[in-house]
Regions:
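Extreme N-terminal export signal peptides that direct proteins to the secretory pathway
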Residues: 1-54
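Short amphipathic beta-strand and strand-loop transition segments with alternating hydrophobic
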Residues: 4-9, 88, 162-166
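Generic structural motif
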Residues: 20, 27-31, 42-44, 53, ...
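A generic structural signal for beta-strand entry/edge sites
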Residues: 21-23, 34-36, 54-56, 63, ...
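Short, solvent-exposed secondary-structure capping/transition elements
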Residues: 34, 97, 142-144
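Short aromatic-centered micro-motifs
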Residues: 39, 59, 151
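Self-processing/autoproteolytic domain segments and adjacent N-terminal interaction modules in large
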Residues: 51-127, 189
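Proteolytic cleavage junctions
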Residues: 103-189
């Protein structure tokens, strides 16, 4: 599938491999409000992305979109040296601290992880960036300038992600990361 997407992207971009952007879209319309998304790329697919100098890999999961830049793809290839599994799932809010629960409220919480086939997990990339966009439709009661992305730490505390912001045009909360963790949409009081 990935090889087909790369070939399609090359044709669409007139063979300009330097600016090649590959997009994988999950058909979430049938799933409605999905609980789990799982993308497995074998070692050949990861190698092909790096070999073709793909500028970015976009993984569109409906509620959550991840965009890996070329440095992140190279780092994943280097770190995993095998197949790569990208997982996005709705997280359980039971583990949130009381304070985090107030910040997050009924807003979405997701777990992101990247593992190799041998269950080796990547938590932080040494190089590269991942742009994350989480769908969220702000209510009229919420001040859009107070909506941010929060990292949920191992104690259930919510830590605001620097540079995160709400985009009212796309109705997404956006941030850039080097790591994989539990993230939530929250609103400052």
């Amino acid at each position: 599938v990935l090889k087909k997407e790369i070939t399609k992207a090359e044709k669409e971009q007139g063979g300009r491999i330097k600016d090649l952007s590959v997009e994988i879209t999950f058909d979430t319309a049938k799933a409605g409000n999905w609980k789990n998304l799982h993308l497995e790329m074998d070692g050949q697919a990861v190698n092909l992305l790096v070999k073709k100098n793909v500028k970015e890999l976009k993984v569109n999961g409906g509620n959550v979109n991840l965009t890996f830049d070329s440095k992140a793809l190279k780092e994943l290839k280097k770190e995993m040296n095998t197949a790569v599994v990208i997982k996005m799932k709705q997280a359980d809010k039971k583990n949130l601290s009381a304070r985090a629960g107030k910040i997050i409220g009924k807003r979405p919480v997701y777990d992101f992880s990247v593992t190799g086939i041998k269950k080796k997990q990547s938590s932080v990339l040494k190089k590269g960036r991942i742009r994350v966009a989480v769908s969220y439709n702000a209510s009229k009661k919420e001040k859009e300038k107070k909506i941010f992305a929060y990292k949920i730490d191992k104690y259930g505390a919510a830590v605001k992600i620097p540079g995160s912001y709400y985009d009212s045009d796309t109705k997404t909360v956006n941030f850039v990361s080097r790591g994989f963790f539990t993230v939530a949409v929250g609103c400052e009081k």
